Each structure stands twice: as structure tokens, then as C-alpha cells.
Amino acid sequence: MTYSPGNPGYPQAQPAGSYGGVTPSFAHADEGASKLPMYLNIAVAVLGLAAYFASFGPMFTLSTELGGGDGAVSGDTGLPVGVALLAALLAGVALVPKAKSHVTVVAVLGVLGVFLMVSATFNKPSAYSTGWALWVVLAFIVFQAVAAVLALLVETGAITAPAPRPKFDPYGQYGRYGQYGQYGVQPGGYYGQQGAQQAAGLQSPGPQQSPQPPGYGSQYGGYSSSPSQSGSGYTAQPPAQPPAQSGSQQSHQGPSTPPTGFPSFSPPPPVSAGTGSQAGSAPVNYSNPSGGEQSSSPGGAPV
């Protein structure tokens, strides 16, 4: 019988080609310039505003030993706080897109604010004690000056900003899958059938079948090793039938011969007492496999 490509169980042919692995390609995002100067300007602006709001606290406290009541005064700290606020405003303006940067002026104002604040702290009147707000404002102004100076050094190139880490697209495009390679025999048939696209040197010149003994058919249908022209599979050959035997052989090999091949024996006929002439006769030979019996005369010797 013949299997056509439409029948169930027929394997689907796979495309031939070279097998390629998956090659994911990740798209690099634009690194751009370092954002460290922008972060430093933000720090300058925030610290200047924090120093300004902290200056509303008790900077100096009037001592009670002089007979005065407890009171909080600002002393000479107004100027350093004003300078720090100006530096914060200039740094904030530089954050606006396409705005001119005044990083040099901001750095100068930051350092100037630190010097003025230190001078006001140590030159306080003897009747006043230092309040908690003075130390907070001094800390904010010092950190503001440090950030302003770092921004100036990065802007001028004295300090190299760290290179930003390369960013990859999390949804990168993947390469195309290659086709499956050729492994000698093309798919499309049963039991080692060769494909139609196989090289001519590897194809079989004709059907090759193992020799079968004469008179016996193959138990299984033979399969042709050459590809069919339609490419639909193998055609099974019906088993050969054994030749018919002659009538004479069938008559000799009838029911007298069991399946084992040994001759069958039947019991001898009973001898009656009244027949004296046959009492001394020899027994009949029943071992003839051909089934014929030879007659013997009464009293004669067996043949």
C-alpha cells in the first residue's frame, strides 16, 4: 500500500538549510554627558535655601548674668546668610534649560559665605551665647560651598566626572532563527527513504532487496530503497504465495502423515478362530509410508 502526504502519520518535511543560534542584539541607549554638574547645582540651591530658613532660629542668646532677660538675637549673621541665599538662587537659575551657567560666581559666593559665617561666630559679643541655629546654618553654608567648588572643578575639567554606565534596551531585538541543517537524508518518507534533493552520488541505483528462498514469500512487505517519483512514501509489495503442489503429492501426504512427519500405524485386524487357514499366516507389513499394502498367500512367508 502507498502512503500519501495527506494521510495521517505521514511526517511533515522540514526545510533544509543551516542551523543558526539565537543572536540577541541589545540596543545601546545614548550615554550623553555626565549629570554630575546638574546634581551639584541642585545641592547648592537646596543647601542655600535650608541655611536661609534655619537662620530664623536662635542664632545668639542673651546671657542672664547681665541682668537682661532671655532673648534671641541674630547678631552679624545676616550677611553670611544673604550671600548663601544669593548663591542658591544663581545655582537654581542654571538648572533652567538653555540658561547661562554662573558656576564661577556661585563658587565664589559659597566660599565667601563660609568666611563671613565663621567670622560672625567668633566675633560675637561677650553678652551673648551661641544658639543651636548658628551651628545648623554654619553646617549648611559649609556644605554649600563644597558643592559649589566641586561643580566649578568639574566644569573646568580639573576633576573628571565618572563615566555613566551604559544602558541597554530591556526589550532588545533578537536575531532570526536559522534553518535546520542537512543531515544526509532528506525527510519525507519511511524507513530511510532518500529525499528528492539528495546528491546523485549518494542515491541508490535501483531497488535492493535481500534474496528470499524460493517457494516462500516475505513475511513483511518489501520496501523500495529508491525514492518514489511522487514523493509520497514507500509501496509495500505483497508477499509471494507458495506454488501449488501436485495432486499425487497431496494424496501421498494426506491424513496418513501427521504434522511431525512420522508415519501413522493402524492396529492389525482381528483374526477369527474359525479361519484355520489364516492362523499361520504372516502379519501384514503396515510400515509402508506410501499407504499401499502387499497381499500374501495363506501360509506364505512375508515379503
Swiss-Prot record:
The membrane topology noted for this protein in its Swiss-Prot or TrEMBL record is:
Multi-pass membrane protein
Disordered: region residues: 194-303
- Coiled-coil stretches noted in the UniProt entry, renumbered to this chain: none
Q: Which Pfam families match?
A: DUF5336
- Post-translational modification N-acetylthreonine, affected residues: 2
Q: Where is the composition biased (Low complexity)?
A: 194-207, 215-255, 287-303
InterPro entries noted in UniProt: DUF5336
- Localization terms from the record: Cell membrane
Q: Which cysteines are joined by disulfide bonds?
A: none
What domain of life is recorded for the organism? Bacteria
Gene Ontology, cellular component aspect:
peptidoglycan-based cell wall; plasma membrane
Looking at the UniProt entry, the stretches that span the membrane are 42-62, 77-97, 102-122, 134-154
* Keywords, ordered alphabetically: Acetylation, Cell membrane, Membrane, Transmembrane, Transmembrane helix
Q: Does the keyword Cell membrane apply?
A: yes
**Where in the sequence does UniProt note compositional bias of the Polar residues kind?**
274-286
Composition-biased stretches, type Pro residues, lie in: 256-271
By sequence similarity, the record places it as follows: To M.paratuberculosis 34 kDa antigenic protein.
- UniProt-recorded name of the protein: 34 kDa antigenic protein homolog
In its UniProt entry, the species of origin is given as Mycobacterium tuberculosis (strain ATCC 25618 / H37Rv)
The organism's taxonomic lineage, starting at the top: Bacteria, Bacillati, Actinomycetota, Actinomycetes, Mycobacteriales
